[in-house]
């Protein structure tokens, strides 16, 4: 349904779906020339937060799902948001993920300099993310989350959607799927 965008650079290298919103935001902030509030979900990359810090902007997190991102955008009157799945939401167009909006924002960023897409990407904060899932058909996923919470006592915890453990430059997010008998596990670090 053309709501997400995956990017490939001029060398044929995929940049990763997590960086669609980051590159779009980079150009958006440079064009705007003022601070902005972004909304992304809990499972999205830290790269946007680190970029926002560099550009005097903020990032707020929502539960996973387009509807949750949009609700948070409305709550804080944010103009731009998205998810680390290639989805970008721009209020001035409409409050839904849209790959054509993402394409426009990416092309806007590319037009702001003579840098190649690979150079734009490499200038951004770099993180590696792992996304996995575990079958929990006969396992109490709440018990898994409870046990994990006791293991990571030194981390900041967010429980709006499963549990996310965050340190300065890394995080782990555990959440039960709403559609399958699985637990999704996401982790990111430099």
Set out the residue ranges of the language-model regions:
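Short Gly/Thr/Asp-enriched flexible loops that form oxyanion-binding sites at enzyme active sites
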Residues: 4-21, 48-49
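Short, acidic/small-residue loops that bind anionic groups at enzyme active sites
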Residues: 14-35, 63-65
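Phosphate-binding and adjacent anionic-ligand microenvironments
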Residues: 31-190
């Amino acid at each position: 349904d053309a709501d997400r965008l995956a990017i490939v650079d001029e060398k044929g290298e995929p940049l990763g779906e997590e960086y669609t919103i980051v590159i779009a935001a980079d150009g958006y902030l440079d064009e705007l020339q003022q601070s902005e509030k972004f909304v992304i979900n809990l499972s999205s990359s830290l790269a946007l937060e680190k970029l926002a810090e560099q550009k005097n902007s903020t990032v707020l997190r929502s539960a996973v799902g387009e509807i949750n991102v949009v609700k948070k955008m409305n709550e804080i009157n944010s103009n731009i948001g998205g998810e680390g799945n290639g989805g970008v939401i721009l209020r001035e167009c409409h409050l839904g993920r849209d790959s054509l909006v993402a394409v426009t924002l990416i092309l806007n960023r590319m037009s702001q300099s003579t840098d190649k897409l690979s150079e734009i990407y490499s200038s951004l904060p770099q993180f590696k993310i792992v996304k996995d899932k575990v079958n929990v058909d006969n396992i109490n996923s709440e018990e898994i989350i409870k046990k994990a919470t006791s293991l990571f006592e030194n981390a900041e915890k967010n429980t709006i959607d499963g549990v996310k453990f965050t340190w300065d430059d890394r995080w782990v997010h555990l959440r039960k799927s709403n559609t399958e008998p699985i637990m999704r596990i996401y982790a990111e670090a430099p």
